[in-house]
Amino acid sequence: MSQSQSARASFEVGAERVAKCPPDVVIRQLLDASRWPRWQPEIVATVGPERVQVGDIVRGHADLLGFGVAGQAAIEEVPDDGLVEDVLVGVRMRVTYRVEPRGADSLVRATIVTEAPTGVSGRVLGFLLRRRLRRMQRTALDRLTRLAEAQSGTEIIEP
């Protein structure tokens, strides 16, 4: 996010899940933009590389709160343990995924930081947005871990 955006009030939501597979299997799902609609509940379609790199732009369509919107994700960082994106889909969000080994499994963490809406209506919208982002994030991580587990051939464990 730009400096002027980071000076405004923002809020953060986070979630984590354990995947019963090695981290590299989860990372492959994260970095393949064509797979995002399979595990991110709001994403309908994407156009982007099979393995994103810093500087890539992934464009797509999403369904947010009943509205179809065009969006894009600018890939900011691709460390060995995850992905950092600047996402613009109705609102701007900095989305970070980190995957770390946990024995034979993987701990997958996701964090979303977004600008808080302002004004009286903004407070109501902010409340609804936080709830939606938390739910969306939990669903995304549930789906991501299940897909990674299925890809690795391990048994899928319900959360």
Put a short name on every predicted segment.
Residues 1-53, 146, 159:
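Hydrophobic ligand-binding cavity/cleft-lining segments
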Residues 4, 57-63, 83-89:
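Short beta-strand segments that buttress and anchor functional surface loops
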Residues 12-14, 68-72, 92-96, 107:
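Short, surface-exposed coil-to-beta transition loops
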Residues 20-24, 51-54, 77-81, 98-107:
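A short, structured loop/turn motif at beta-sheet edges
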Residues 21, 64-66, 114-118:
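Beta-strand elements of well-folded, non-transmembrane domains
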Residues 25-30, 36, 58-60, 75, ...:
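Hydrophobic pocket/interface hotspot
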Residues 64-78, 85-86:
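Helix-adjacent hinge/juxtasegments
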Residues 87-139, 155-157:
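Beta-strand/loop substructures that line and gate deep hydrophobic ligand-binding cavities in soluble
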